[in-house]
C-alpha cells in the first residue's frame, strides 16, 4: 500500500518536500511529502494548508451517511489551479473522484470511513493536527481504527531520526502498549519527532496534561458506537424488521413506515426525513428509543407481529417528545381511510389489558366508529398519545375508553405538554416549573428567533429585564424548553437532529449580543466540540443567550443544572468504564463474593443496626475459629522453653527502658521549651511596657472609643436635633419678616393716604388661565396697563387715581419681599448644606467601627482574654496617665483664653476686639492638643474656619450672639480689609498705627464735649462689646483673618499671606463693583433719556398752560400744617429710618439713649442683604474714604455739568418724576415743585413728610441717579428707603458750625486708624465731630466724593447758627425731633462731609425743644431764598433727601 510513496520519493525536489510538511519534519520531509501532495500538482505546494481546513466538515458529514465519506476524498478534481484547491476541499467534496486522471501524480486513497472525533490536542497546532490526520487516514486500511506497527515504523523512519530515538518515541506514544497506534497516539509520535528534529530533548515521561488529552482522545475513539445498522439491530427485536426493509432507503426506521400498508408515500416520506436527523451514531439510539409508538401503530393493524412492541414500549420512556411530533405528521395521512380494514382485527380485545397488548384498548374504539372516517383517523393518533402516557400515568387507560369521543378534540392540547415532559423525569433537567409571575420576554424570544422573523434586536432587548428579571433561574423551565424546541424544529427543516455552526451563527446573531459572548455561549453549549448542536445543547445555548439578554453574566463552566441528560449519561458511562479499567484487569480484581447481587434478590445488611445479639446469626466457622484460637494460645505458650521466656522478658525490659528514656527526654525538652517561652514572654512584656511608656509620654490624639462615641452622640444631637429645628425656625422667621414688611409697608401707605383702601391683588386682573385663574402674564399685563395709565395721565396733565398707584406699589413691595425671602432661603439652604458637609467630615473622624470597638474592649479593657494576659493589660492601663474629661478641658481652654490675649503681637492687635484675639489664641493652642478634648476643640475650630470660608464665598459673614455683633464683625473685617488695601507692606500698617494716639486724643476731646446721655450710650456699647468678647469666640477664625493655627509662625509671613488674601478679595470686590456700576449706569442712562423727553414735553405743556394749576397747591398749605397726625407720622419715620443705619455704623456715640435701645434695626443685622450692603455702601466702608480702593467712586464726577443743568431746571419749576424707585412714584408731576412756588414747596415739605425720601426743589434727576450708583440693587421696599436715606442725605450742620476746623482735621483723620474697641470703625473713618443735641437722631453716613466747590451763595442766606450755642435739654420720651432748616445752603467748602454728622444741628438751635410752634413765615422765607439760587453744591443738594427732612414736631 505504501510502495507508491517509496517509488515517488525521488520525483519530488527538496523544496517541495519542505513546504509540504511545514509543521512536521524540518530536516527530511521526503517521506511524508509525497503522501500529502500526491493529489496535487507539484508546482503548487501552498495548497496543503487549505486541505487541513477541510478535514472538519467531512468528519461531520460522515456521521450522517456513509456514502458521503466516499465522496470526500475526491475533492481535488480541479487541481491544476490554486483556487479550486483552496475552496474545493470543503465545497466540492461530493463530486470528487469522477476525474481521477486529471493529474499524473499517483492517487492515494484516504480512509474516509475512519471515525476520528473532532477533538483538539492542545500541544499540537490545528494545522499540524489536520496534516497528521490526513497522513493517518492514508495509512490506515478500511475497517481498522489504528495504524499497525509496521506502517507506523515506515512513516517514522522517514523522519531520519536514529532508531534509538524512534524507540523512545514509540514507548512514549504507545500508551496502551497494544503494538498499534490510534490517531492521538500517532499524532503524539509525530509531534515528538518534530521536537527531536528541532533539537529539543525528549521527555522521559509524558507531561500529565498531554497524557490526559491523549487518553481522553483514545477513550472517545474506543467508546464510539459503530455506525453499521446491522450491528445496531443485532440482538434487538427489530432485526427481522430491518431485514425486510427497503434496501433503497438504507434506513433502519423504514419498517415503521411499512406498517401503513395502504397509506401510500406520505407516511414513508415523513419517516424518511426523521431518520436523517439522527444520522449520528450517538443520536440514532436516542431516536430509536424515542419513537416506540410508531411501531406499535404499525404492528397494531395486522401487518407486523406484536413482538417488536416489547422493546419499543420499554424504551419509549427516554425520549417521548418525538411522539407528538410524529403523530401530528401522521394524522393527515391516516385520514385518507386506508386504516379502516386494519381496525377490524381488534374488536374483541379487552381495553384494560396491559403488557404487550397495550394497543388493544385503544383500537376498540375503531369498532364502534368504523363508519366515521375522520374519527377513526383521529383515534389512531390518540393511540400514540395514550401509549406515551402508559409509563407516566397508568390511570389514564380506563378513562380513555369512556372519553374516546372527547379525546379526539384534546389531541393538540395533549401533544403540547408531551414536548416538555420527555426531557426528564420530574425534578430533572428541563422539568422546572415556571416561577410565579412568569419570566420576561419569552414570547419575544419565540417570535424573534424564528427563521421568518426580521425584527430588530431592540425589540428583543426592550422585552427583557424589568421586575420579572429576578425570576430567571439557572434551570430551563418547561415553557422555555417548549419554545427552544419549537425554534430548533423551525430551523432544522431537514430533520437532521442537529444545527450546524453556520446556521447557529444566523440564529444567535439575531440576539444582538457581542461576539465574545456568543463565542463563550457556543463553547459552553458544544461540550463535545463537534461544531454542531443537538436539541438539548441548542436549548442550553438559547437559555444562556436569554440569561445574557437579561443582564446576567455568563458562567465560566456549565453549571450542573444546564448539563443535558444525554451528556450526563454518556459521561457517567465513560467514567464508569474508565474506573473499571483503572482498577485493573480480572486477574488483579478481588474475588467475587458468593451470592447473587441482581435485582431479584434483596440482601439486608444487619451491620447497620447498633446492637446484634451474639446468639443470632452465629456462623459455625466463627465458633470453630474461636475454639481453635483458644486452643492454640495455650499450646503455643506451653511450647516455649525457659530460655525463650527469659529472652522475651529481657526484650520487654529493653523496650520499657527505651520508652522511659524517651519519656525522660521529652520531659526535659518540654521544660526547656517552657523556660524559653517564659523568657520570650518576659522580653515581650518588657517591650510592651517600654512602648506603653512612650505612648504615655506622647498621649494619643485619637481619643478613646468612649470619648469618640460621646462626641459622636453630641454631634448627632446637634446636627439631627438642634440644627434642623434652627433651620426651620429661621425659615419661619424669614416668612414672618416678609409678612411684617408687607404689613408695615401697607401701614405706611395708609398713613400717607388715609383715604386709600388696599384692593385685592387679583381684583382688577382678568385671568386668562385655566378656570379663570390669574397667571403671571396676566399680572404683568395688568401692571403694564397701570403704568401706561400713569404715564398718559402725567403727559396729559390729568389726575390719575392714586389708589391704583398705591395698589401697584403694594404689589411691587409684595413681589420684592417674596424675592428677597427666596434669596435668603437659598442662602440658608447653602448654610445647611455646609453644615451637612462639616457633619460628614466630623462623623468620618468620630465613627467607631465594630472591629475597633471589639478590639478596644478586648485589648484595652482586658475582656475575653486569658487571666494572665488580662492582668497584664490591667497593669498597663494602671500605668496610663489619667486623662481630663472634656468638660475639664473646655474649662481650662476657656480659662486660658484671656491669658493668651496679651501675647498676640499681630498687627491687628489694636484693631481686633478682645474676643477675637482670645479666640485666635485658643485656636492656636488647640493645634497643640494632647488630649482628645483638645483635639475635639481643634476640630471645632477648623470646622468654624471652613464654615467662614464658605460664607465668605457667598458674600456673608458669621453672626455674633449679641444684637450688634454682626456690625462689629463686619467693621472689624472692614478694618483689616482697608488696612491692608491702603498699605503695601506691614510697615505702612505700623506707621498708621503710630497715628493712633492722636486719634485717641481727639476721641477724648469729643467725649468731653458730649452730653451725659451719649456717654451712657458709650458705656452700654462697651458693655456690649465685652459681652461679645465672651460670646463671639466661635467666629474668631474668620475675624482674625482666617489664621487659627499660624500664630507660632513668623509674623511677617502671616502679614504677607493675609495681605495677599486681602488683595485678592479686594480685586474680586472691585470687579463686582465695576460690573454692577456698569449695569446700573446703562439702566440710568436709558431712564435719563426717557425722563428728559418727558421733561421737555411737560415743559412745553406748562408754558402753554394757564396759571390756575399753579395756584392749586397753595390751598393745601393749611391742611399740611403741623398737626398731630403729621407729627406722629414724622416721628415714626424719624425713629425708623435713621436707626437702621445707626446700628450698622458704630457712630452711635452721638445718638440719644432712648433710640439706641430701639430693637427695630436688628432686622438688618440678621439680613444678609444688609451685610452685603454694609460691605459695599455703609459708612463704615466708604464714607469719606479717599484711600480706600474698594469703594472709591470714580465715575460720579463726570455728571457734574448735567447736575447743574438739572438743578437749574428744577429751580425753574420743572418736574422731578422718574421711575427709579417706589418712593418716587408717590409724587407725580402735579405734586412736584414744578412752579417754584413757596406754598407748593411748603406743602411738599409738610404734606409728604411721611415719605422717607421726599423730592424737593434742590434734588435733580441727575443727582438722584448719581446717588443711586452707590446703592446696591435690592428688591425690598424698606431697604430702598433706607438706602436712599443713607446716600442722599448730607450732614451740613457741622460744616456750618466749624467749617475751618473740619477742613483742617479731616485729612489727618482720614489717615489715622482707629484702635479703640469702644469705637470699632474702619480705618478709613474720619472721627466724628462734636455730637449734636441728644434729642436728634444722627443721620447715616454718606459716601459721596467731594465735588468741585460750588459758587458762593447769595447774600440773603440766613445766618449760620453758632456752633458754640449750648445744646437744648433732651426732649421728653416720645417727643419728635425738631424741625430742621433743611434748605439752607451752607457756605462753600472743599472737604467732603463728615460721617456721623447730623444735618439738623442748625435746625435744632432754632426750633423749640417741645415742638409744635414753628415759625412758618421764616421757613417759607428761607425756602423762597433757596428756590432762587442759580447753582447749589452737590453735597448741599442732598439735604432735602435726609431721613429727618420735613419732620414736624
UniProtKB/Swiss-Prot annotation:
Residues 1048-1058, 1105-1114, 1219-1231 have a biased composition (Acidic residues). It is a peripheral membrane protein. Residues 161-196, 513-548 form the EF-hand domain. Residues 1-86, 239-366, 386-427, 579-638, 877-935, 956-1418 are annotated as: Disordered. PROSITE patterns: EF_HAND_2, EH, WH2. Gene3D superfamilies: EF-hand. GO terms for cellular component: actin cortical patch; endosome membrane; plasma membrane. Residues 49-86, 239-249, 258-275, 296-306, 323-353, 398-422, 579-588, 889-907, 914-926, 959-986, 1027-1036, 1253-1263, 1284-1295 have a biased composition (Polar residues). Residues 595-606, 1064-1073, 1082-1104, 1192-1203, 1264-1283 have a biased composition (Basic and acidic residues). InterPro entries: DUF1720, EF-hand-dom_pair, EF_hand_dom, EH_dom, WH2_dom. Residues 1050-1108 form a coiled coil. Keywords: Actin-binding, Cell membrane, Coiled coil, Cytoplasm, Cytoskeleton, Endocytosis, Endosome, Membrane, Repeat. Residues 128-217, 480-569 form the EH domain. It holds the Pfam family EH. It is found in: Cell membrane; Endosome membrane; Cytoplasm, Cytoskeleton, Actin patch. Component of the PAN1 actin cytoskeleton-regulatory complex required for the internalization of endosomes during actin-coupled endocytosis. The complex links the site of endocytosis to the cell membrane-associated actin cytoskeleton. Mediates uptake of external molecules and vacuolar degradation of plasma membrane proteins. Plays a role in the proper organization of the cell membrane-associated actin cytoskeleton and promotes its destabilization. Belongs to the PAN1 family. This is Actin cytoskeleton-regulatory complex protein PAN1. The gene is PAN1.
Amino acid at each position: 500500500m505504501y510502495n507508491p510513496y517509496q517509488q515517488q520519493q525521488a520525483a519530488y525536489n527538496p523544496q517541495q518536500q519542505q513546504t509540504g510538511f511545514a509543521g512536521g519534519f524540518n530536516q527530511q520531509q521526503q517521506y511524508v511529502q509525497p503522501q500529502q501532495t500526491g493529489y496535487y500538482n507539484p508546482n503548487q505546494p501552498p495548497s496543503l494548508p487549505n486541505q487541513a481546513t477541510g478535514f472538519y466538515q467531512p468528519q461531520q458529514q460522515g456521521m450522517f451517511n456513509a456514502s458521503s465519506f466516499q465522496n470526500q476524498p475526491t475533492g481535488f478534481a480541479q487541481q491544476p489551479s490554486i483556487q479550486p484547491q483552496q475552496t474545493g476541499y470543503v465545497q466540492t467534496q461530493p463530486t470528487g473522484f469522477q476525474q481521477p486522471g486529471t493529474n499524473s501524480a499517483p492517487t492515494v486513497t484516504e480512509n474516509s470511513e475512519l471515525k476520528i472525533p473532532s477533538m483538539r490536542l492542545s500541544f499540537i497546532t490545528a494545522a499540524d493536527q489536520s496534516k497528521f490526520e490526513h497522513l493517518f487516514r492514508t495509512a490506515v486500511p478500511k475497517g481498522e481504527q489504528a495504524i499497525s506497527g509496521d506502517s507506523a515504523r515506515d512513516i517514522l523512519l522517514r523522519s531520519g531520526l536514529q532508531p534509538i530515538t524512534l524507540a523512545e518515541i514509540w514507548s512514549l506514544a504507545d500508551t496502551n502498549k497494544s503494538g498499534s497506534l490510534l490517531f492521538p497516539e500517532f499524532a503524539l509520535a509525530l509531534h515528538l519527532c518534530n521536537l527531536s528534529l528541532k533539537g529539543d530533548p525528549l521527555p522521559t515521561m509524558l507531561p500529565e496534561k498531554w497524557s490526559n488529552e491523549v487518553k481522553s482522545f483514545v477513550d472517545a475513539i474506543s467508546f464510539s458506537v459503530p455506525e453499521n445498522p446491522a450491528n445496531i439491530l443485532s440482538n434487538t427485536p427489530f432485526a427481522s424488521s430491518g431485514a425486510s426493509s427497503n434496501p433503497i432507503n438504507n434506513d433502519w426506521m423504514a419498517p415503521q413506515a411499512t406498517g401503513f400498508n395502504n397509506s401510500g408515500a406520505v407516511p414513508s416520506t415523513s419517516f424518511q426525513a426523521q431518520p436523517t436527523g439522527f444520522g449520528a451514531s450517538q443520536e440514532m439510539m436516542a431516536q430509536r428509543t424515542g419513537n416506540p409508538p410508531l411501531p406499535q401503530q404499525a404492528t397494531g393493524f395486522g401487518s407486523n407481529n406484536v413482538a417488536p412492541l416489547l422493546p419499543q414500549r420499554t424504551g419509549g420512556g427516554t425520549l417521548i417528545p418525538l411522539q407528538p411530533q410524529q403523530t401530528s405528521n401522521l394524522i393527515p395521512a391516516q385520514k385518507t381511510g386506508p386504516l379502516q380494514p386494519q381496525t377490524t382485527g381488534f374488536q374483541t380485545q379487552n381495553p384494560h389489558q396491559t403488557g404487550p397488548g397495550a394497543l388493544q384498548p385503544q383500537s376498540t374504539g375503531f369498532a364502534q366508529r368504523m363508519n366515521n372516517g375522520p374519527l377513526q383517523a383521529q383515534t389512531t393518533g390518540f393511540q400514540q398519545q395514550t401509549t406515551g402516557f402508559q409509563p407516566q400515568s397508568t390511570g389514564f387507560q380506563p378513562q380513555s375508553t369512556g372519553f374516546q369521543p372527547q379525546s379526539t378534540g384534546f389531541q393538540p392540547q395533549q401533544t403540547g405538554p408531551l414536548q416538555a415532559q420527555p426531557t426528564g423525569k420530574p425534578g430533572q433537567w428541563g422539568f422546572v416549573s415556571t416561577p410565579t409571575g412568569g419570566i420576561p420576554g419569552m414570547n419575544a424570544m419565540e417570535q424573534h428567533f424564528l427563521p421568518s422573523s426580521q425584527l430588530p434586536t431592540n425589540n428583543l432587548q426592550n422585552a427583557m429585564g424589568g421586575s420579572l428579571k429576578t425570576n430567571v433561574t439557572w434551570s430551563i423551565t418547561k415553557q422555555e424548553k417548549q419554545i427552544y424546541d419549537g425554534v430548533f424544529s423551525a430551523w432544522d427543516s431537514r430533520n437532521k437532529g442537529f444545527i450546524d455552526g453556520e446556521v447557529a451563527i444566523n440564529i444567535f446573531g439575531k440576539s444582538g449580543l457581542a461576539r465574545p459572548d456568543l463565542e463563550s455561549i457556543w463553547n459552553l453549549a458544544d461540550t463535545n466540540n463537534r461544531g454542531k448542536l443537538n436539541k438539548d445543547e441548542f436549548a442550553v445555548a438559547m437559555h444562556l443567550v436569554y440569561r445574557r439578554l437579561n443582564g446576567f453574566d455568563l458562567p465560566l463552566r456549565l453549571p450542573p443544572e444546564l448539563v443535558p441528560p444525554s451528556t450526563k449519561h454518556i459521561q457517567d458511562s465513560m467514567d464508569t468504564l474508565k474506573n473499571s479499567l483503572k482498577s485493573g484487569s480480572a486477574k488483579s480484581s478481588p474475588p467475587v463474593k458468593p451470592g447473587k447481587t441482581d435485582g431479584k434478590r434483596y440482601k439486608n445488611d444487619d451491620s447497620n443496626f447498633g446492637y446484634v445479639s451474639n446468639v443470632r446469626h452465629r456462623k459455625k466457622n466463627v465458633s470453630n475459629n474461636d475454639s481453635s484460637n483458644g486452643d492454640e494460645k495455650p499450646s503455643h505458650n506451653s511450647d516455649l522453653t525457659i530460655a525463650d521466656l527469659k529472652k522475651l522478658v529481657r526484650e520487654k525490659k529493653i523496650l520499657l527502658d527505651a520508652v522511659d528514656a524517651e519519656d525522660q527526654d521529652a520531659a526535659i525538652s518540654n521544660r526547656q521549651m517552657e523556660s524559653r517561652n517564659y523568657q520570650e514572654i518576659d522580653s515581650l512584656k518588657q517591650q510592651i511596657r517600654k512602648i506603653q511608656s512612650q505612648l504615655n509620654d506622647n498621649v494619643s490624639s485619637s481619643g478613646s472609643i468612649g470619648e469618640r462615641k460621646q462626641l459622636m452622640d453630641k454631634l448627632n444631637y446637634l446636627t439631627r436635633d438642634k440644627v434642623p429645628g434652627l433651620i426651620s425656625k429661621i425659615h419661619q422667621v424669614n416668612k414672618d419678616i416678609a409678612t411684617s414688611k408687607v404689613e408695615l409697608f401697607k401701614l405706611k401707605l395708609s398713613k400717607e393716604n388715609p383715604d386709600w383702601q388696599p384692593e385685592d391683588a387679583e381684583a382688577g386682573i382678568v385671568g386668562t388661565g385655566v378656570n379663570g385663574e390669574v397667571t403671571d402674564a396676566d399680572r404683568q399685563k395688568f401692571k403694564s396697563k397701570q403704568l401706561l395709565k400713569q404715564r398718559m395721565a402725567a403727559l396729559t396733565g390729568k389726575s390719575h387715581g392714586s389708589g391704583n398707584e398705591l395698589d401697584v406699589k403694594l404689589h411691587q413691595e409684595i413681589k420684592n419681599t417674596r424675592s428677597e425671602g427666596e434669596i435668603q432661603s437659598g442662602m440658608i439652604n447653602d448654610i445647611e448644606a455646609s453644615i451637612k458637609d462639616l457633619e460628614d467630615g466630623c462623623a468620618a473622624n468620630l465613627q467607631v467601627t465594630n472591629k475597633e470597638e471589639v478590639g478596644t474592649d478586648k485589648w484595652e479593657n482586658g475582656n475575653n482574654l486569658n487571666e494572665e494576659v488580662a492582668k497584664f493589660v490591667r497593669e498597663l492601663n494602671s500605668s496610663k496617665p489619667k486623662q481630663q474629661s472634656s468638660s475639664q478641658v473646655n474649662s481650662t481652654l476657656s480659662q486660658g483664653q484671656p491669658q493668651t490675649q496679651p501675647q498676640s503681637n499681630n498687627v491687628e492687635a489694636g484693631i481686633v476686639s478682645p474676643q477675637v484675639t482670645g479666640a485666635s489664641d485658643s485656636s492656636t493652642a488647640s493645634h497643640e492638643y494632647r488630649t482628645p478634648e483638645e483635639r475635639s476643640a481643634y476640630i471645632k475650630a477648623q470646622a468654624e474656619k471652613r464654615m467662614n470660608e464658605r460664607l465668605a464665598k457667598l458674600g456673608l459673614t458669621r453672626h455674633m450672639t449679641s444684637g450688634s455683633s454682626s456690625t462689629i464683625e463686619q467693621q472689624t473685617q472692614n478694618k483689616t480689609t482697608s488696612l491692608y488695601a491702603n498699605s503695601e507692606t506691614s510697615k505702612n500698617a505700623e506707621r498708621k498705627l503710630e497715628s493712633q494716639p492722636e486719634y485717641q486724643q481727639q476721641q477724648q476731646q469729643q467725649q468731653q464735649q458730649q452730653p451725659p446721655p451719649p456717654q451712657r450710650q458709650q458705656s452700654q456699647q462697651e458693655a456690649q462689646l465685652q459681652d461679645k468678647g465672651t460670646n463671639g469666640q466661635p467666629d474668631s477664625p474668620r475675624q482674625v483673618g482666617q489664621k487659627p493655627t499660624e500664630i507660632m509662625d513668623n509674623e511677617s509671613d502671616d502679614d504677607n499671606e493675609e495681605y495677599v488674601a486681602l488683595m485678592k478679595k479686594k480685586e474680586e470686590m472691585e470687579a463686582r463693583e465695576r460690573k454692577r456700576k456698569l449695569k446700573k449706569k446703562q439702566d440710568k442712562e436709558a431712564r435719563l433719556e426717557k425722563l428728559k423727553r418727558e421733561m421737555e414735553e411737560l415743559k412745553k405743556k406748562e408754558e402753554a398752560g394757564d396759571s390756575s394749576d399753579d395756584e392749586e397747591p397753595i390751598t393745601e398749605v393749611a391742611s399740611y400744617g403741623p398737626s398731630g397726625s403729621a407729627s406722629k407720622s414724622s416721628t415714626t419715620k424719624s425713629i425708623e429710618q435713621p436707626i437702621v443705619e445707626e446700628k450698622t455704623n458704630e457712630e452711635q456715640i452721638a445718638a440719644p439713649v432712648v433710640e439706641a435701645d430701639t430693637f427695630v434695626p436688628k432686622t438688618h443685622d440678621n439680613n444678609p442683604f444688609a451685610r452685603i450692603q454694609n460691605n459695599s455702601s455703609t459708612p463704615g466702608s466708604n464714607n469719606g474714604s479717599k484711600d480706600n480702593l474698594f469703594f472709591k467712586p470714580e465715575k460720579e464726577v463726570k455728571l457734574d455739568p448735567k447736575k447743574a443743568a438739572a438743578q437749574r431746571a428744577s429751580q425753574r419749576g420743572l418736574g422731578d418724576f422718574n421711575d427709579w424707585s417706589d418712593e418716587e412714584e408717590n409724587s407725580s408731576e402735579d405734586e412736584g415743585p414744578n412752579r417754584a412756588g413757596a406754598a407748593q414747596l411748603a406743602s411738599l415739605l409738610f404734606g409728604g413728610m411721611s415719605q422717607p425720601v421726599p423730592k424737593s426743589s434742590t434734588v435733580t434727576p441727575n443727582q438722584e441717579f448719581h446717588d443711586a450708583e452707590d446703592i446696591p440693587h435690592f428688591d425690598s421696599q424698606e431697604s430702598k428707603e433706607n438706602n436712599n436715606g443713607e446716600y442722599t442725605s448730607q450732614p451740613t450742620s457741622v460744616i456750618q458750625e466749624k467749617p475751618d476746623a473740619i477742613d483742617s482735621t479731616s485729612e489727618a483723620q482720614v489717615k489715622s486708624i482707629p484702635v479703640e474697641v469702644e469705637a470699632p470703625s474702619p480705618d478709613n473713618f474720619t472721627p466724628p465731630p462734636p455730637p449734636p443735641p441728644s434729642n436728634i437722631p444722627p443721620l447715616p453716613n454718606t459716601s459721596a466724593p467731594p465735588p468741585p466747590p460750588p459758587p458762593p451763595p447769595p447774600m440773603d442766606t440766613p445766618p449760620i447758627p453758632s456752633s458754640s450755642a449750648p445744646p437744648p435739654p433732651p426732649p421728653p420720651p416720645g417727643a419728635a425731633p425738631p424741625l430742621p432748616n433743611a434748605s439752607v445752603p451752607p457756605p462753600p467748602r472743599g472737604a467732603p462731609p463728615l460721617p456721623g454728622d447730623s444735618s439738623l444741628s442748625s435746625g435744632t438751635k432754632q426750633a423749640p425743644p417741645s415742638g409744635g410752634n414753628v415759625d412758618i413765615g421764616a421757613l417759607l422765607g428761607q425756602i423762597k431764598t433757596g428756590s432762587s439760587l442759580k447753582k447749589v453744591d452737590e453735597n448741599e443738594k442732598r439735604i432735602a433727601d435726609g431721613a429727618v427732612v420735613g419732620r414736624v414736631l
